[in-house]
Structure formats: C-alpha cells, structure tokens
Amino acid sequence: MSTVKEQLIQNLVPEDKLSRCKITVVGVGNVGMACAISILLKGLADELALVDADTNKLRGEALDLLHGSLFLSTPKIVFGKDYNVSANSKLVIITAGARMVSGETRLDLLQRNVAIMKAIVPGIVQNSPDCKIIIVTNPVDILTYVVWKISGFPVGRVIGSGCNLDSARFRYLIGEKLGVNPTSCHGWVLGEHGDSSVPIWSGVNVAGVTLKSLNPAIGTDSDKEHWKNVHKQVVEGGYEVLNMKGYTSWAIGLSVTDLARSILKNLKRVHPVTTLVKGFHGIKEEVFLSIPCVLGQSGITDFVKVNMTAEEEGLLKKSADTLWNMQKDLQL
C-alpha cells in the first residue's frame, strides 16, 4: 500500500543534497545562539549546523529553532556533537570556550581555551577544508592566532571578530553625542579587543568633516567636551552589560553576522577585524590584532594602511605588546 507521501508527491529529479552556502556555529551558549538567530533572520545560509559537546542543551536549542522554521527562510537546520555535521561549510563560527572561574588568572583561562581550540579545530578542518573561520571566543585576538596555528589555514581565512563590535559601539556613542545616526558617524577602534584598544580620533568624521579639525584636543585629557569618555564607555560597555544581565549576546551576534554577510556575499567591505599584523605599524612579533581589513569570499583579501598620529601608532604598538606578553608563554 502506498504511503501518503507517495500518493501526494511525484518525484521528477533526484534532490541535490549538497548545500551551497552552509554555516556552522560551534557553541550554543548565549553568544552562539545570538549568532545563529541573527544569521537565520538575515537569510545568509541555505543550511545552518550547530555543534556543541552538551547534547541536551544542543538538542533543545536546535528544536527551538526548528519549531520556528515556518518563519525562517533557511530550509535546513542540523545539529550534532560530532563535527561531521559541519561538513562542507563555507563559514565556521567558533563561539565555544571556557569562562573564568574564581581565583583564575587570564593566562589560566587562556590556556584552558587553547585546549578547547585544540579539540575543536581539527574536526572543522577535516570536514570543511576550504572554509573560512571566524573566532569569537575571548580573548579573541590570541585565540585567532591559536586557531591559525592549529588549522594550518592561510592567514586570510582565519578571522577574529576583533574590534568590529568595539567600533560599532564607538560609532553609536558618537552618534548619541552628536544626535546623528551612527551609520553617518565614521570612526575606528583598532588593536586589542579589550582594555588596550585604540580609538583613532584623527580619523573620526561626519560627512568628511573630521571632529579633530573642529576640536584639536578631542580624545585627550585637555578636551573640555570630554570625548575621551566615549572610548572609555566602549571599553566598559561589555562589562556593564555583563554586570546587569550576566552575559553579552545580541550586539556580538549582530556584529558577527555583519562579518559573515561581507564574506558570503563577497561585499568587499572594510571591517576592523583580527588578523596578523607582524611587519606593520612597527610591530615585530607574530601578533594578531584588529586593523581595517577588506572582507570577501576569500576571507581577508587586503587591509587599509591607516594614517595615524604618532601617538595613535604608539598606542597600537603598546596594544600589540600587551597581547604578546600573554601570547609568548602559551603552550600550543
């Protein structure tokens, strides 16, 4: 006796089961799921894979999304603990990582996250040898270096989310201060995604008018308008959200999806993301930090040679030194 499906549907051609634009998110915590829902709502993928070691949490999050399939334009959502579920991904986003525990140093946390990357990355490489990888796990700059080393990928295919969110916060806060939409406020935060990040005040502008031409003291201690507090708020913004809601998720999820869109759509947009900067701006060590990079279907294809003041370049070098002092003691 024929099944309902056999009576209802007549197949004409065999289905092509290979996805054309598959994205994998590794880690289904708050950040991973914010990335996942942002990607789904933007319709960037024809298949989304979720990977996590916590199978109950993973299944629950996946089912929650699948139950909303009617409202999404992504036809296939898959999940699993094994990395074969991620096979043939165009883009893999790593959000999995350990959280700091009481009494632990940043180096201790970093070493634990290095161990996690050693467990994650080989499975990604084996199943998706041609993918691009975006690292979101903190400390993102050093872990981007770690993933690059473990993966053996060309440097342009291993991208840290870096200061893309810092720069977005920067532009939002400038816009709030000026009463202008942040898309019309142009400015960059470079260097470490963290306390030593560098605001490039010399380039901040609205409609091509640099704020420094209107206020030469902008961003300094002598500035009577206290613009320096804008960068302070950028640095403290994540901690502020963390203290109030226990974690950050939505802004970083949107930021990562913005990077994914530039890569998958080959938009050639410029983003401040983490990449290898050895040999540039006086940096001699094999350090990864954020500089403005062109993102397209090959990953990072170019970077912009930013005109900085001597002070800004000095701060960028100091940021690199901060990262190197942690990175040099790593055991890979």
Curated annotation (Swiss-Prot):
The PTM Blocked amino end (Ser) maps to S2
Please give the Gene Ontology molecular function terms for this protein: L-lactate dehydrogenase activity
Membrane-spanning ranges:
none
Pfam families documented for this protein: Ldh_1_C, Ldh_1_N
EC number assigned by the record: 1.1.1.27
Q: Which PROSITE patterns match?
A: L_LDH
The family database entries (Gene3D superfamilies) matched by this protein are listed as: Lactate dehydrogenase/glycoside hydrolase, family 4, C-terminal, NAD(P)-binding Rossmann-like Domain
Q: Where does NAD(+) bind?
A: 29-57, 99, 138
Localized where? Cytoplasm
As annotated in Swiss-Prot or TrEMBL, what is the tissue specificity of this protein?
Answer: Expressed within the midpiece of sperm tail (at protein level).
Q: Which GO terms describe its biological process?
A: ATP biosynthetic process; flagellated sperm motility; lactate biosynthetic process from pyruvate; lactate metabolic process; pyruvate catabolic process
Q: Name one GO cellular component term.
A: cytoplasm
Q: What positions does the entry give for substrate binding?
A: R106, N138, R169, T248
Q: Which residues form the active site?
A: H193 (proton acceptor)
Recorded catalytic activity of this chain's protein: (S)-lactate + NAD(+) = pyruvate + NADH + H(+)
* Metabolic or biological pathway, per its Swiss-Prot or TrEMBL entry: Fermentation; pyruvate fermentation to lactate; (S)-lactate from pyruvate: step 1/1
The UniProt keywords, alphabetically, are: Cytoplasm, NAD, Oxidoreductase
Top-level taxon in the UniProt lineage: Eukaryota
The record's family statement is:
Belongs to the LDH/MDH superfamily. LDH family.
Task: Tell me, in a sentence or two, what this protein's role is.
Answer: Possible role in sperm motility.
Oligomeric state and interaction partners are given as: Homotetramer. Interacts with RABL2/RABL2A; binds preferentially to GTP-bound RABL2.
Q: What is this protein called?
A: L-lactate dehydrogenase C chain
- What organism does this protein naturally occur in? Mus musculus (Mouse)
